């Protein structure tokens, strides 16, 4: 590429590493958007499981403990992994710099680091699904969450990281 050739969408690097190491606010916003969509569908799947359980009386589909886990994980995913970080992260990275006429955000490396921290916290919180779930409700109120034998500490640590 010569010195006079500007970088545009035709000669921009391609591949997964170009996405993971990008400093472009639009790409980072798209990564926030896609991860938000993923967590939205995961939280929606948990909501469907709860709705199917409540469709008829009795324990038809899942037990009481699994229902409590689904309720907690649905609320935590939708609040802490979708609404709070993904919507402002996606809209704030894609639309806001374009609306104010900025060529880029002020600190692009910090912007990418915030997405990595969000991803790490989300993976840490999702670890609790594999490791047995949490049954305290998405608010994690102290009287019940301190007496619960479920994975409250890893889940709250993942949310704190986010």
Question: Residue locations for each model-derived region?
Answer:
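...captures the hydrophobic TM-helix bundle architecture rather than a specific catalytic motif
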Residues: 1-162
């Amino acid at each position: 590429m010569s010195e006079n050739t500007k970088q545009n969408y035709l000669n921009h690097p391609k591949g997964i590493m170009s996405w993971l190491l990008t400093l472009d606010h639009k790409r980072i916003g798209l990564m926030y958007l896609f991860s938000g969509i993923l967590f939205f569908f995961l939280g929606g799947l948990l909501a469907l499981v709860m709705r199917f359980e409540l469709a008829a009386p009795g324990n038809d589909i899942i037990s009481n403990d699994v229902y409590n886990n689904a309720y907690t994980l649905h609320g935590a995913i939708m609040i802490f992994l979708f609404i709070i970080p993904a919507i402002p992260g996606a809209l704030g990275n894609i639309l806001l710099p374009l609306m104010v006429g900025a060529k880029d955000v002020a600190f692009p490396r910090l912007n990418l680091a915030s997405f990595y921290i969000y991803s790490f916290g989300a993976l840490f919180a999702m670890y609790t699904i594999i490791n047995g779930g949490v049954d305290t409700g998405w608010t994690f109120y102290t009287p019940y969450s301190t007496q619960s034998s479920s994975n409250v500490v890893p889940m709250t640590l993942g949310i704190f990281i986010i």
